[in-house]
């Protein structure tokens, strides 16, 4: 990933946390009969466990960077690793170029995600603000869909400039790797679905004449359609499974919770009609041959299909690497440098045409390999806190939080056979969505409480 984009992401995250922590003054016009007061959000931040877990993870990665066990060395034609003296009982890393990948580059990415989560948690105090933030994510995804549509219609994947000036690879929307484009659009799809479900639910309860639910549902359908054109088979499969689970949850919720009316038949028919028109236009003007070709290879060759077989072997080599390096880790961002030592035991990997593997194509393996046992425990601790939070808050039937969490779960499943979390855009967005779901649960009563009240 490009350094400039990571620097911009970090700058936005820093600006966000500064704005979130800025003291807020409430005058008598806003407080009613109460005295004016100032609100300091730093107190809320220091009581947020994810703040401390994230800080510990960043400190851990910095410790890896300051205790390198290998040094990256390069000549005019090749590169290799040289062993270095280091403290053997501490986490270690690789002294590698910042321009390629090393612990300091990962500190930038992780800090952006950490600060973004903290900004959402302490800075957004109204549900409307959370909905606006989700709307921004959906709007950004729709802009990417528009760019992808232009690329499909023109057959030119070397747009837009200036992104093409910084890479020699064809682009899928603005992503270098088409699977990352698919994973990002699939994640944004569930943001659109979550907003549509909430507006439908809220409008039904308040007897509103109209809501944005229909527009958001069409946006979700549009995003689903263009996930296919990213040619990401992993994103398509996980999106299909997660959507089926969501449909089952929605039907069960409709039966379990009283007072949730069905959709207006006129609106339902309008959505169906617009969807039919959308499908007709897509099939009329877009070329599906590449999509069918990729799925036909899977259907006819199965696990012996070249890309699938190569990834299976890469997974086997990564498992070998995890067994020998998983205790202390090789350093955040260091997988690509040490992995060739293990690839040489699986020469069939090179039959796929890829001679250098930067990632394990399985985040479930790559993160433990890079971060080691201590880093894994920090991540699992953060995940455990979030799970306990949602269970304790009884978020099972929440109209907005559940679709968001299903979208996040979809990305986690996708990470089992690809590397979506190595893309900073996906990692930061995913972390923010989890925080948005958690903050929403805090600000909105559960569906059970509303029906009982």
Question: For each predicted feature, which ranges?
Answer:
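Interfacial juxtamembrane loops and adjacent helix segments
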Residues: 69-100, 157-172, 292-316, 320-321, ...
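Membrane-interface alpha helices of multi-pass inner-membrane proteins
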Residues: 217-231, 410-415
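Hydrophobic transmembrane alpha-helices of multi-pass, membrane-embedded glycosylation machinery
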Residues: 10-18, 189-192, 236-249, 383-386, ...
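Transmembrane signal-anchor hairpin modules in multi-pass inner-membrane enzymes, especially those
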Residues: 1-139, 195-218, 244-275, 440-453
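Membrane-interface loop-to-helix entry segments
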Residues: 100-112, 174-194, 364, 370-377
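Hydrophobic transmembrane alpha-helices and their immediate junctions
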Residues: 373-403
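A membrane-periplasm/extracellular boundary helix in multi-pass inner-membrane enzymes
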Residues: 59, 67, 146, 151-155, ...
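Membrane helix-loop boundary segments at the extracytoplasmic
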Residues: 1, 177, 366-371, 402-436
